[in-house]
Amino acid sequence: VPDPAIYICNPDDELMRPPDHESWFILVNAPRQTDPNGPDNQPGTLDWHTPGLAQDYADRVLDRMAARGLDVRDRLLWRVVRTPADLEAETGAPGGAIYGTSSNGQRAAFLRPANRSGIPGLYLVGGSSHPGGGLPLVGMSAEIVSDLVGDA
C-alpha cells in the first residue's frame, strides 16, 4: 500500500513503557498473506515471510509519518512489527484479515460464521461473525448471542 491510512494510539500506561517515555501502537492496512498452498500471484496478496519485507514496510510507514510532520524515527527504543502472516498464525484469520472474511460479493453475508458454534457453550459475536462488521451489525450480533445464551 503506497500511501496507507495510519492509525496511531498513544496509551498513557506506565506498564507499557519505560519512565519518561511513550508507548505507541500504529496500525496500517496491508495486503493479506498469500496462501502458500494456493495459486501464485493472487491479486492483493503478499508473502509476508519474504525476508526484509515486513521491516521495509514498517520503515515506509515511519517515512510516511515523517513526511506528514510526525517524525519519531530517532526516538524509537524498539519496535515490534506484526504482519498479516503473524495474525493468521496467531488467530487463524484467513490471510491475517483483521476484519474477518471478505464482505465483497453477493453471497459474502451468508458465508460468515454462525453465532452458535459447534462447541457447546461457545458463541461467536462481532464483526467477523453473523451478521457482519460495523457498529450496528455488531450490536445485532451481540443481541443474537444474548438471546441464544438466554435459551441455553
Residue positions per predicted region:
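C-terminal segments that line or cap access tunnels to active or ligand-binding sites in enzymes
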Residues: 1-84
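A glycine-rich dinucleotide-binding beta-alpha-beta segment and adjacent secondary-structure elements
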Residues: 2-7, 63, 67, 71-131
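Generic recognition of stable, solvent-exposed alpha-helical segments in well-folded globular domains
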Residues: 3, 56-60, 93, 137-144
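Short, glycine-/Ser/Thr-/acidic-enriched flexible segments
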Residues: 11-15, 29-33, 103-106, 128-130, ...
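General N-terminal targeting signals
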Residues: 24-25, 41-45, 89, 93-95, ...
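Active-site-proximal substrate-binding core of FAD-dependent oxidoreductases
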Residues: 82, 150-152
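A conserved FAD-binding loop/helix module that cradles the flavin
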Residues: 107, 127-150
